[in-house]
Swiss-Prot record:
Residues 7-22 have a biased composition (Low complexity). Its main location: other. GO terms for cellular component: gas vesicle. This is Gas vesicle protein O. One of its GO terms (biological process) is gas vesicle organization. Belongs to the gas vesicle GvpO family. Residues 1-49 are annotated as: Disordered. InterPro entries: Gas-vesicle_GvpO (IPR008634). Pfam families: GvpO. A minor component of the gas vesicle. May play a role in transcription and/or RNA stability and in GV assembly. Gas vesicles are hollow, gas filled proteinaceous nanostructures found in some microorganisms. It is not clear what function gas vesicles perform in soil bacteria. The keyword Ligase does not apply. It comes from the Bacteria. Residues 29-41 have a biased composition (Polar residues). The gene is gvpO.
Length: 128
């Protein structure tokens, strides 16, 4: 059976339509794939979660439980806290030794460093 010019034109149109459909499917598949590879943005930890985590991490490293947090602030790199720790229990309690630790955390709340900045008896106030 011989192809007529009309048959040839229909074949070319079908071929072009198939090519366009394949191109659209490919573009759609790439867009779907790109969305699948995007990671959902993590929410930063809440200040309370950071505070509790910092106290727990400091206790794990020093073996001493935090008594209180005297300062807590967000920095460019994460967080900075001052944590009061009971270092030596004495009787009476006013003679117990406390220490103030400066604790640095990254933006995710992971401890990146700490140092003792002050040691004092519980019953003594700061001198001005």
């Amino acid at each position: 059976m011989a192809n007529t010019p009309e048959d040839t034109q229909n074949t070319q149109n079908d071929s072009q339509n198939d090519s366009q459909n394949d191109s659209q499917k490919d573009t759609s598949a790439r867009a779907t794939s790109a969305r699948a590879h995007q990671q959902p943005q993590e929410q930063p930890p809440s200040p309370m979660r950071v505070l509790r985590g910092a106290c727990a991490q400091l206790a794990e490293l020093t073996g001493m439980e935090a008594e209180s947090v005297s300062s807590f602030e967000r920095t460019e790199d994460g967080w900075t806290l001052n944590v009061e720790v009971l270092e030596l229990a004495r009787v009476p309690d006013t003679m117990s030794l406390l220490a103030s630790y400066e604790v640095e955390l990254d933006a995710h709340g992971e401890l990146s460093g700490y140092r003792r900045v002050r040691r004092y008896e519980r019953g003594r106030s700061d001198r001005s």
